[in-house]
Amino acid sequence: MTETINTAAQFPSFEKPTVQFNEKGWGPCELPDTFKDVPYQPFSKNDRLGKICDWTNTSNNDKKYQNKYASSFGTGNQYSYYHEEDETTFHLVDTARVQKPPHQRGRFRNMRNSRSGRGRNARGGLNTHGMTTLSGKNVKARDPRHGRGMGKKFGHRGPPPKMRESSVAVRADWASIEEMDFPRLIKLSLPNIKEGVDIVTCGTLEYYDKTYDRINVKNEKPLQKIDRIVHTVTTTDDPVIRRLSKTVGNVFATDAILATIMCSTRSNYSWDIVIEKVGDKIFMDKRDHTEFDLLTVNESSVEPPTDDDSSCNSPRNLAIEATFINHNFSQQVLKTGDQEPKFKFEESNPFISEDEDIQVASVGYRYKKWELGSDIVLVARCEHDGVLQTPSGEAQFMTIKALNEWDSKLANGVEWRQKLDTQRGAVLANELRNNACKLAKWTVQAVLAGSDQLKLGYVSRINPRDHSRHVILGTQQFKPHEFATQINLSMDNAWGILRCIIDLVMKQKDGKYLIMKDPNKPIIRLYDIPDNTFDSDDSDDGEGDDEGFQQVYNYAHNKI
């Protein structure tokens, strides 16, 4: 008997599904109820769908790349992740604080380091020279305060920076020819400039007193007020340059004017130089009755002096004080007297006549020339302040300058009476930071003159509140070329800046021009000015042109 096998019961049946036909596009015409209201976005398996949370460190790097977790397959952003700050718990808090004077800022810094276990020479602590040391290459990356654009002025509630005034008021009839920014000037270079050749030597020098080399903090010496005439004659008023301009050279200047131009990239204060072009000759002059010959104080400091003019610590009064100290120090350290030997050059002082019976400062003048290429011959008057006789009997010429301490607490400086004998390098490094332009100009003047030594004196106030009495705390000497290397002063760059300005003026027509450093920007501008500008009979002279120096001390502009 054969049994009938029911194949339909043993195998599942296949039901034909209903397929919707979409005449207008791809995909089904209707969505099932289970997939309704569900967002859809095209995606790729390479997309990053999430991020590991880090609750221990808040970083600002994601703000720059907010779309790095977005889909790279489509244009939708349904599932994109954005790192946003939670502002639900944000409240305004008064963070204003009283502005402390400069000498009180950071007074507990060492105490905080000691409490946190960061002592001297420890990791991240202070070394023996008082400088903070940070180990590791990515220290700034681990500190959120060092983020880009963060931490520099965070929480700053101080007054806005004071705008400096221009050295001369720019008039409406002045035409601006060229603007030279410092980044461009720093890249200039004019190598292989040989040493200047002497043309004429004038004046009389006194010998240096070596007893001043033994002065220290414990054996200080008062600074004397010496009544001597110091001539600061500009280029066109120099009778020797007038004589030489007929036969030698086509660019004429003084060492002070050249040093100002060569070190212009280190200057912050405004200054100006008048240039007159006559045919193929250029004469660089300073204006009369200006502050060009005053020595700046803390010009390159982080917090330069900004007191009112009535204060003895105002920028102008400090400059007059520094000039007063520098002139007196350069004469006090010399052996004076009728019986003392003197070094005489070929010609006498060109700024005094034979019948004049006056006390003239010890200054030797060298009129030198340099070949700058392209038929440009520079003639300049350089100066020596003294002469030193070596044991072999050879005469070494000196450039003598003085650094002055006015108030170390207000100047954020180093206390000289505590550090000068034991850490003189730290004192000099601090002065290089605060007076970079002034020291660079002194070095350039010594190099141009061919001085064998650059003698620096350290002069301080007896009382920080008394700006009329000073003491000498020590001296230090350098070779000008070696000191230029120490302060990162490139003479090739200095010659390049000077040559750039000479070339610009040579391209102009005959007339009068003015170079001015912008008081608030690192820019030098060249102006074309009328020929009668700054003349003595010009009643509409610039602001402050007819104003002499303030009589803070009992000496005139050219008298110590």
UniProtKB/Swiss-Prot annotation:
Transmembrane segments: none
PANTHER family on file: EUKARYOTIC TRANSLATION INITIATION FACTOR 3 SUBUNIT 7, EUKARYOTIC TRANSLATION INITIATION FACTOR 3 SUBUNIT D
Domains: entry comment: The RNA gate region regulates mRNA cap recognition to prevent promiscuous mRNA-binding before assembly of eif3d into the full eukaryotic translation initiation factor 3 (eIF-3) complex.
Species: Drosophila erecta (Fruit fly)
Functional description taken from the UniProt entry: mRNA cap-binding component of the eukaryotic translation initiation factor 3 (eIF-3) complex, which is involved in protein synthesis of a specialized repertoire of mRNAs and, together with other initiation factors, stimulates binding of mRNA and methionyl-tRNAi to the 40S ribosome. The eIF-3 complex specifically targets and initiates translation of a subset of mRNAs involved in cell proliferation. In the eIF-3 complex, eif3d specifically recognizes and binds the 7-methylguanosine cap of a subset of mRNAs.
Name the record gives this protein: Eukaryotic translation initiation factor 3 subunit D-1
Family from the record: Belongs to the eIF-3 subunit D family.
Signal peptide span: none
